Amino acid sequence: MKSLALFPLALALALPLSAQALGRPTFGFSAQLNAPLGNLKEDTDKTLGAGASFLVQWNFTGGHAVRPRFDVNVFNVSIYEPSHSNYRESRDLSAVGLGVDYLYYVGGTPKGLYLTAGAGVTRWDLSYTTSDQVGNGFSSSYDRSKNTTSLGAAAGLGWQFTRVIGLEARFVHSPYKAFDLSDPTSTTRTDVNRDGNFLQLAGIFRW
């Protein structure tokens, strides 16, 4: 399983060597909103997540492209903010991933409608944060525990409006482990698998 999990990373590192004769890569950044589904929707109380990605893309002839990516996505699990107080505590589920996407541009060139599918490795973490301000004093605490590292997959479609601006929608599957929902301060995982499904809408900017 570990060797399979390292495959997308090895592929991403090998791509620059294999694509040197096909032109220079383009670099990009995406900002995304994530709508949780299934188990993730239950664990985050239907709260939208947010994230960002760094992208490198090699374009091939015939509308084909390969795109390694580095992703950071965060979902809020719970927030506690008592009235008439500056005290705040929150739990967040974060996903940091490295993957590779295949893109196919329907028109044969890197513009307009395209389809995409990919795979990658994701590390999930659960964090607990508190902050409080009394007068001129400020205090905070932070605790984070690794939840799991898992293989994931994604598929979707997008539209490249210009050479710089694009919009993409993807379904992402990236399993994680369940945690104690009844204790808002806990970052401990269990051995129960959760599906980790979400829909992602991303604005993409390339240069």
Each language-model region and where it sits:
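Individual transmembrane alpha-helices with interfacial aromatic-anchor signatures
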Residues: 144-146, 150, 155, 188-196
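Extracellular loop and loop/strand-boundary signature of outer-membrane beta-barrel proteins
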Residues: 37-43, 83-90, 137-144, 184-191
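Outer-membrane beta-barrel porins/channels
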Residues: 101, 135-148, 179
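Gram-negative (and chloroplast) outer-membrane scaffold detector with strong preference
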Residues: 22-26, 33-35, 50-136, 159, ...
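C-terminal/domain-terminus segments
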Residues: 172-202
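Conserved active-site loop/cleft motifs that coordinate metal ions or position small ligands
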Residues: 165-171
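Cleavable N-terminal export/targeting peptides
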Residues: 1-24
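Surface-exposed strand-loop-strand hairpins of Gram-negative outer-membrane beta-barrel proteins
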Residues: 32-55, 143-148, 182
